[in-house]
């Protein structure tokens, strides 16, 4: 009798345990696949939907332990081994309250988890010092239970949540590592979250958008080459497709590749820690009408199989499945046949409404469903009632003192003038309202209904902000290259009456002397020397009672000059900046007045001028309108006279460069080539000998002006300016 009772009680305990295990869910399969960048995915399958596990990481030995609450194990093989550089073995064990997976690694690693239906995806990659936690004492994991042993020792290790971004332990570890790292995860709103840790960077990052890329730049923060990495996160089904961390000169760039419609939320958790949340744009559930954009359904999956059932009954079932409060209008009627399997409940509701031309308006967890025309009529009546109330409501007055904008700028924005400042002249002010401006106090005075005043408040909050500033640095280089060569001759003769017993003499120098006799000088001496000869040779030869002198002179010069100017100017966005360097030349101007003439002196500029107007685009580019003029004094012929004039050269252009890029403006180039020849008529034309009766000159001058313009956007909330 006792034996039978014992067997019955044992059977009840076994059945109860089996029922509890079945109701909680069991691990049925484990599969491993590879991703780029040495990343692994462990896909754990369950026989029903489960929750995200908790776990912890140990570095010695390198393991990842995951605990699944109220979960059993239903696998034939509970120890899986792999010949992989990162993952070596997976062991599964369970006790009365939970199941544990222990992932043995060949090197320290880190992980992230994601629940997908009845599967848990575990993403594993090599550990980075920035996000590991060496400051925390290592936790030694309990060994996995053998394959035949279903009950394991109680789990006593501390459990760490895997979704907590930048815990104090992580920050402390990253501070000791002095490195830069990125991490990616997905939240419950289907948003991609990128966490950036940049130790040693104390400023704010520059964020810009280029098409489907978000570019985050950390200025003057150098990234080691070994830390450059790229994450392909397209499988997470978020707006983020790829995350790249790379080095660009002395800067660090984080490039987020996106798809579809999204919005960016930037958060700073601590100095050097930044979180970027890329959210899919919310769909307006309260708007009616046809929307051709693809819809996203996130409700719990259900199965429906009805034939010729009242629509109101289907709505009642959907209300129970979704937990929403659905209120159906009296106009909702009819029957329909419906057969759906594993479809989100919100998609099933959308199909029912489309089939019967219904629409909905949602407020909190209450959904009002009615025919589309009926809801549109209610919306129209509501808006008309609001308009009637606004036309009859009280008027209020509000003063807005502007901080950064000039109140006169709002005159053109609101289309105001002194003759009419009522709502007939602009779109914001109602028919009974008015707007006044006070330039003395830079104040805008608005008199209108509360709703209009609130619109003004929002408009002023958006427009009355500090203008972005641009530091424009110009490098002006003027290079000159000159060459000149001159060759001349001086030819003549002197003589005296020859004395008895004298012989001819030879000597150097034009003034070589001869003694005795009466001197004579040739009247046809050739004098074609170089103006400023570098060298000359004089020859004197006695001929009978005279002498022939010949002086050859030559000059050659080579010049190279370079002038460099480096002016800088700070200007606001879309405001003109001007840099000038040069002279003011006085000119005498004669004017007729009364019966005589009066003379006045006027100053004219002869300058090298640079005028730049920057325009910052929404994606961080800079469009620059550039005007360059180079004026210099010159001599101009006026009849038989030479007067002072100004030579002018100018250049106008518009170009777009990135922030910190350089625009090169050239094309102002001059080259002067000249050859001169002075000779004695007839004698200078004689071949060979004619060179003694000529002076030749050759001159070449080249000048080129190059201007390098580098704009940089200044962070108005950042550090002080540096020149």
Swiss-Prot record:
Domain of life: Bacteria
Keyword ATP-binding: no
Cleaved signal peptide residues: 1-24
Pfam families named among the record's database cross-references: AMIN, Secretin, Secretin_N, STN
InterPro entries to which the protein is assigned, alphabetical: AMIN_dom, GspD/PilQ, NolW-like, NolW-like_sf, Pilus_4_PilQ, Secretin/TonB_short_N, T2SS/T3SS_dom, T2SS_GspD_CS
Keyword rRNA processing: no
The entry's keywords: Cell outer membrane, Competence, Membrane, Protein transport, Signal, Transport
SMART domains for this protein: STN (SM00965)
Subcellular location: Cell outer membrane
GO process terms (BP): establishment of competence for transformation; protein secretion
Coiled coil: none
Effects seen without this gene: Cells show decreased piliation and transformation efficiency. It uses hemoglobin as a heme and iron source in the absence of a hemoglobin receptor and it has elevated sensitivities to various antimicrobial compounds.
GO CC annotations, alphabetized: cell outer membrane
Cysteine-cysteine disulfides: none
Assembly and interaction partners: Homododecamer. Tetramer of trimer.
Official protein name in the record: Type IV pilus biogenesis and competence protein PilQ
Gene that produces this protein: pilQ
């Amino acid at each position: 009798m006792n034996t039978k009772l014992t067997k019955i009680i044992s059977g009840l305990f076994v059945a109860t345990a089996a029922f509890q295990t079945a109701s909680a869910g069991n691990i049925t399969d484990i599969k491993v696949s590879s991703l780029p960048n040495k990343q692994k995915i462990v896909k754990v399958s369950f026989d029903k939907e489960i929750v995200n596990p908790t776990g912890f990481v140990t570095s010695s030995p390198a393991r990842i332990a995951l605990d699944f609450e109220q979960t059993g194990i239903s696998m034939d093989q509970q120890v899986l081994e792999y010949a992989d550089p990162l993952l070596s073995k997976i062991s599964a064990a369970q006790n009365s309250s939970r199941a544990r997976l222990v992932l043995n690694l060949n090197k320290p690693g880190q992980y992230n988890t994601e629940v997908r239906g009845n599967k848990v995806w575990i993403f594993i990659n090599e550990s980075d010092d920035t996000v590991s936690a060496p400051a925390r004492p290592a936790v030694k994991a309990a060994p996995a239970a053998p394959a035949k042993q279903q009950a394991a020792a109680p789990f006593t290790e501390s459990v760490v949540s895997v979704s907590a971004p930048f815990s104090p332990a992580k920050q402390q570890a990253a501070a000791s590592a002095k490195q830069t790292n990125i991490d990616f995860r997905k939240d419950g709103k289907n948003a991609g979250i990128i966490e950036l840790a940049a130790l040693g960077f104390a400023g704010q990052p520059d964020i810009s958008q280029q098409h489907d890329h978000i570019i985050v730049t950390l200025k003057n923060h150098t990234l080691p080459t070994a830390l450059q990495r790229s994450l392909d996160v397209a499988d997470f089904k978020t707006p983020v497709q790829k995350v790249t961390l790379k080095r660009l000169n002395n800067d660090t760039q984080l490039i987020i590749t996106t798809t579809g419609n999204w919005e960016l939320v930037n958060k700073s958790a601590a100095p050097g820690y930044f979180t970027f949340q890329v959210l899919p744009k919310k769909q307006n559930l309260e708007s009616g009408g046809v929307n051709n954009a693809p819809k996203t359904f996130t409700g719990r999956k259900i199965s429906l199989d009805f034939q010729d059932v009242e629509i109101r009954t289907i709505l009642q079932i959907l209300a129970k499945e979704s937990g929403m409060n659905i209120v159906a209008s009296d106009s909702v009627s009819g029957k329909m046949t419906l057969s759906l399997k594993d479809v989100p409940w919100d998609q099933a509701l959308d199909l029912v409404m489309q089939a019967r031309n219904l629409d909905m308006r949602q407020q909190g967890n209450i959904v009002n469903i009615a025919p589309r025309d009926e809801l549109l009529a209610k919306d129209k009546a509501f808006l008309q009632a609001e308009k009637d109330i606004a036309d009859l409501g009280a008027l209020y007055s509000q003063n807005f003192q502007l901080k950064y904008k000039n109140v006169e700028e709002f005159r053109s924005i609101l289309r105001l003038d002194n003759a009419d400042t009522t709502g007939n002249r602009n779109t914001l002010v109602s028919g009974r309202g008015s707007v006044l401006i006070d330039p003395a106090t830079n104040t805008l005075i608005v008199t209108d209904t509360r709703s209009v005043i609130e619109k003004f408040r929002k408009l002023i909050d958006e427009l009355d902000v500090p203008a972005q500033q641009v530091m424009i640095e110009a490098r002006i280089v003027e290079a000159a290259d000159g060459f000149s060569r001159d060759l001349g001759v001086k030819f003549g003769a002197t003589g005296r009456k020859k004395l008895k017993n004298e012989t001819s003499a030879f000597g150097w120098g034009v003034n070589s002397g001869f003694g005795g006799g009466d001197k004579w000088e040739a009247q046809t001496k050739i004098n074609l020397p170089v103006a400023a000869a570098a060298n000359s040779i004089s020859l004197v030869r006695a001929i009978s009672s005279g002498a022939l002198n010949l002086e050859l002179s030559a000059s050659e010069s080579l010049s190279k000059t370079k002038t460099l100017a480096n002016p800088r100017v700070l200007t606001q966005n879309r405001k003109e900046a001007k840099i000038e360097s040069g002279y003011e030349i006085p000119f005498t101007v004669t004017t007729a007045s009364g019966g005589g003439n009066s003379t006045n002196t006027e100053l004219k500029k002869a300058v090298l001028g640079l005028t730049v107007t920057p325009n910052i685009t929404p994606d961080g580019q800079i469009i620059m309108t550039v005007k360059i003029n180079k004026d210099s004094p010159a001599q101009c012929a006026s009849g038989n006279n030479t007067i002072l004039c100004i030579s002018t050269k100018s250049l106008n252009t518009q170009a777009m460069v990135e922030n910190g890029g350089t625009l090169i403006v050239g094309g102002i180039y001059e080259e002067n080539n000249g050859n001169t020849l002075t000779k004695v008529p007839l004698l200078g034309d004689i071949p060979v000998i004619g060179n003694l009766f000529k002076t030749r000159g050759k001159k070449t001058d080249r000048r080129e002006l190059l201007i390098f313009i580098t704009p940089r956007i200044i962070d108005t909330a950042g550090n002080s300016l540096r020149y």
